[in-house]
């Protein structure tokens, strides 16, 4: 049954590259076969409940700009929000969604009331998933918005806050499991510090390690088959976050013996904030064996903060999905649009148009990446660049020869290497041919 929020808008369909219909896909064709698999199964698109239905359009200098009928802290409003959200999911045709607990339920007076509200909404979600075929990519807990978390959740100096946060995560994992969620995400929005003057760094890292260990232990205890994911971000809202980037998260996981239990959910905007390219973070996660899922958005490259805009740069998407394909593609992960409308984009159809454009951009990037992979456009030059290591001397350097033996061979054979071109411009031109 329609809520009426989206008026007479019909289900979004693929119309091909020549279409000028803003409410149709031009490049995303769910059933198109790419590298032997349906495009939908490659991309595994998800809608973010928080930016799409909970964000009010505020910024640091101004309040709410969106006028939505569900904007109140009442359970009936939360139910209306669920109706509108699932209507949107059906119109768009993305197969997955994601949520924080605080996105979907009212804020209660205490933990028990929060849990009751969450369970009431999960009852509704179960029915709607059965009716629509929608699936949950991942669930998570909001451990950063409420003032109790102003000094962190897992890293809070108050053990009562740690306990409240842990109990909240337990209920959110339960909800995620019940809804068939394929992952559970932890984003440490306030797991960091503003100043070292009031921060015990060693204690806070140990507490965060303990918290994550409890999550992993509970996952196995209840038989949750999904993947536990950490989402790196360098700062904002804190000055310095402990899950700064992929490399930092991997070091943290190794320190606490969790590198085989936890993977990463990499957001493009967070990679940019950390001073990296998106493909760098994806490539490093793949190399370290912790690649899990992605949050797809972009930042404004001039503003210096997290703007969470829909992707619109096909070359960037091509290089990103090239790394995803090199990793073997998604298993439990997917492409979650952690992107929000601009605060002046007030119309309901703007929400559809933003997602349609993002999905088309990702589809173009995926197809370009697949062609580069099939043609060996980047892999062949890379193999040539490192070919020397496949020879007898290269293999001996990596196993068998000691430092003094290497020095002896260099002198005896008069090894005097000459530099070779890295051919960067050539490779960049190759990428541009595909996009």
UniProtKB/Swiss-Prot annotation:
Keyword Isomerase attributed: yes
Cofactor(s) it depends on: Mg(2+)
Organism domain of life: Bacteria
EC number, UniProt record: 5.3.1.5
Cofactor binding: number and manner: Binds 2 magnesium ions per subunit.
Subcellular location as annotated: Cytoplasm
Molecular functions (GO terms): magnesium ion binding; xylose isomerase activity
Catalytic activity: alpha-D-xylose = alpha-D-xylulofuranose
Keyword Kinase: no
Transmembrane segments: none
Keywords recorded for this protein, A-Z: Carbohydrate metabolism, Cytoplasm, Isomerase, Magnesium, Metal-binding, Xylose metabolism
Active site positions: 100, 103
Family the entry assigns: Belongs to the xylose isomerase family.
Record-given protein name: Xylose isomerase
The gene coding this protein: xylA
